[in-house]
């Protein structure tokens, strides 16, 4: 285990939330699977304090890059709890998708997120789809666009599918992107314009 990883894992137990958050962010970048168990333990403790939502977000995002599919049951339970914070549900959707992708089961993970009806969770999953540049099969793409287009074009749920669609194909996708270009949100229009040109742009999650 690299020295940087060992030190970051140690700091997950620091009394300071800011230092724990910094450690989680570093582990997210390092993407070392040896940190997965420590991150899961730290996250279980962290979610007990709603004041540390930023730290919870970073730990959840880090679990998505350092964890394993065996962490999915805990993550899925966490993100559907009624008291789980908005930021953690966003990161949870991202992490569920990433860990599922390790087993090539991301289409099932997307459908699971869609079935919850939680726009925040779905947005997190689509954020990961965009960052991983995943091509989706036609059925999954249709399910995603049905979910998104049932919402107002003013809704932020449109942004990440507009980015991710750079790697999708089909008439439905083209119609969605064309609609986004003329829609009310400038960020979505910009992302859709790039996707129509086959470019993912340089967007990054928080």
Tell what function each PLM region has.
Residues 1, 10, 18-33, 53-68, ...:
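Structural detector for internal amphipathic alpha-helices that build alpha-solenoid repeat scaffolds
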Residues 1-11, 30-47, 68-81, 101-115, ...:
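Amphipathic alpha-helical scaffolding segments comprising HEAT/armadillo-like alpha-solenoid repeats
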Residues 15-17, 47-52, 82-85, 117-119, ...:
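Short inter-helical turns and helix N-cap capping residues of alpha-solenoid HEAT/ARM repeat scaffolds
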Residues 16-19, 39:
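A short linear-motif detector with a strong N-terminal bias
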């Amino acid at each position: 285990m690299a020295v940087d990883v060992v030190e970051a894992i140690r700091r997950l137990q620091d009394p300071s939330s800011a230092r724990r958050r910094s450690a989680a962010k570093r582990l997210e970048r390092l993407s070392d699977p040896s940190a997965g168990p420590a991150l899961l333990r730290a996250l279980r403790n962290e979610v007990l304090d709603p004041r540390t939502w930023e730290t919870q977000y970073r730990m959840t995002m880090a679990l998505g890059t350092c964890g394993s599919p065996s962490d999915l049951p805990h993550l899925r339970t966490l993100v559907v709890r009624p008291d789980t914070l908005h930021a953690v549900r966003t990161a949870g959707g991202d992490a569920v998708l990433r860990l599922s992708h390790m087993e090539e089961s991301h289409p099932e993970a997307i459908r699971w997120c869609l079935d919850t009806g939680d726009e925040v969770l779905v947005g997190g999953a689509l954020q990961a789809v965009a960052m991983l540049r995943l091509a989706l099969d036609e059925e999954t793409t249709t399910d995603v666009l049905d979910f998104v287009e049932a919402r107002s074009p003013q809704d932020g749920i449109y942004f990440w599918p507009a980015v991710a669609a750079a790697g999708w194909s089909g008439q439905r996708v083209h119609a969605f992107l064309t609609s986004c270009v003329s829609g009310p949100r400038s960020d979505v229009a910009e992302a859709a314009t790039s996707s129509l040109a086959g470019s993912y742009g340089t967007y990054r999650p928080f």
